[in-house]
From Swiss-Prot:
The keyword Repeat applies. This is Low affinity immunoglobulin gamma Fc region receptor III-A. Disulfide bonds join 47-89, 128-172. Residues 21-207 are extracellular. Residues 227-253 are cytoplasmic. The record marks 221 as: Important for receptor turnover.
Length: 253
């Protein structure tokens, strides 16, 4: 029967298992960063995650189905309606990413943003994008049906710090040639305030609990180890004294 692991070895083994279970998630990034695009737009999805040395294999999922591409970047050269949906990725040393939604619209204009939910204090960037980048001018951004900003030449709308007042429905309109075009309406939500960021130096509660339990186990095992060692030494010392006494008694006879 094999000997039980010493306390320190047991602690290291369990700690290594805990780290192996805590695999970082991969991350899907859009390039350009817009969550909504028009038909025929060019879009690249990039997967950020850890790879084994010399192996950049990446698994891509579209609406839950595995894609044939295994490259770190997945390119859509001319977007179609069926390219819209949910994308996720995974690398050799990263777990499956959270889903990223890509919306493909049919029309002349689309109002673009990196996402539709923001925290108070975050910047918001909106873009009025035309199909095949047709020249667009006299552009108006509207919030809840009211004009928010006008540009004679098409420009992005920047909101430096989002507040609750920036929540609402948005669309843009402008001229392509002599034709007045409008985008579909989208909803932007501003939440907040954002939860305070916990310093990475502070361990999550489950890791703290794990360390406390392992510390107690280590202390108990260490105490038991030294107690057994002390008893063994005492027993050996008593046995030596008994043997020595018996030997001296024999000589006296």
């Amino acid at each position: 029967m094999g000997q039980p692991l010493p306390p320190v070895a047991l602690l290291l083994l369990v700690s290594a298992s805990s780290r192996a279970a805590d695999v970082p998630k991969a991350l899907v990034l859009l390039d350009p960063p817009w969550a909504s695009v028009l038909k025929d737009d060019h879009v690249t999805l990039k997967c950020q995650g850890l790879h084994p040395a010399g192996d950049n294999t990446t698994q891509w999922l579209h609406n839950g189905s595995l894609l044939s591409s295994q490259a770190p970047a997945y390119t859509i050269t001319a977007a179609r309606a069926e390219d819209g949906g949910e994308y996720r990725c995974q690398t050799g040393l990263s777990s499956l990413s959270d889903p990223v939604q890509l919306h493909v619209h049919l029309g002349w204009l689309v109002l673009q943003a990196p996402r539709w939910v923001f925290q108070e204090g975050e910047p918001i960037q909106l873009r009025c994008h035309s199909w095949k980048n047709n020249k667009l001018h006299k552009v108006t951004y509207l919030q809840n049906g009211r004009g928010l900003r006008y540009f004679h030449q098409n420009s992005d709308l920047h909101i430096p710090e989002a507040t609750r007042n920036h929540s609402g429905s948005y669309f843009c309109r402008g001229l392509i040639g002599h034709h007045n075009m409008s985008s579909e309406t989208v909803t932007i939500t501003v939440q907040g305030p954002a939860n305070p960021v916990i310093s990475s130096s502070v361990l999550p509660w489950h890791q703290i609990a794990f360390c406390l339990v392992m510390g107690l186990l280590l202390a108990a095992d260490t105490g038991l180890y030294f107690s057994v060692q002390r008893d063994l030494r005492s027993s050996q010392r008593a046995r030596k004294e008994h043997t020595l006494g018996w030997s001296l008694g024999s000589q006296d006879k």
